[in-house]
Amino acid sequence: MRIWGKVLGAFFGFLLGNIFGALLGLWIGHRFDRGMGLNFRRAPTQQQQVVFFHATFAVMGHIAKASGQVTEQEIRVASNLMDRMRLAGEQRARAQESFRQGKEADFPLRETLAEFRRASQGQRDILRFFLEVQLQAAFADGKVEANERAILHIIADELGFSRIELARILAMAEAQMNFFNRAHGGQYQDGGHGGQQYRQEAPSRDRLKDAYQLLGVSESDSDQEIKRAYRKEMSKHHPDKLAAKGLPPEMMEMAKEKTQEIQQAWEWIREARGIR
């Protein structure tokens, strides 16, 4: 129980010379204690990051095994993710072991997800980022199979996302894949993701459509609605905010890549619509 804010607040308030000052100081101290309590509860720990790290690759391995046999493309997606996270040596070995565990027939999917949700303290931005990473595995061969979709339903259920929310995030993830492939010549699943520069020429009609979907909006939405959606997506995926909520340092580069794609989608839409 944190009371020092209340004690000090009341003391300095009393120095003002009356009971009202003390009460005001007590109230301010109470608000301070509450704020500090939230910060302590939400501060990411190494254990939280370990749980996130393991769950990411274990669940990815489980999705890869959903069709019965792990394909070369699915292995490549996992390997490319490790490359983007700059994993080497012991860290890479841990990621590979987690991926292998996820492929086992008796892998405890729901228990792993429940542990991850507890470790992340139910923070929606972190849970959504995790789900978006898993969608990369599901889209490894360019489409989501029925068995993979069934696993995604379980993931969404355990993380607290409705089917409607999952469908929306799934559509945005597919748009992200198409957006990148059209901008870079189809390299998304082949690992040409990190550090890419977007082409400067005007976007095609298809690229513009993907840009709208990546922001979760449609062409019929108003400029203000699109601008609001852009800012919301940037806030959700801001690397520093995600790190403060428990995102492992190794995944910071992925968060940066996501914000770059959101930024580019907005720039293309803004230019096409003449938004200032």
Predicted segments with their positions:
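Small-residue-enriched hydrophobic alpha-helices in membranes
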Residues: M1-H62, E72-H237, A243-R276
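Catalytic "initiation/cleavage/transfer" segments centered on a nucleophilic residue
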Residues: S67
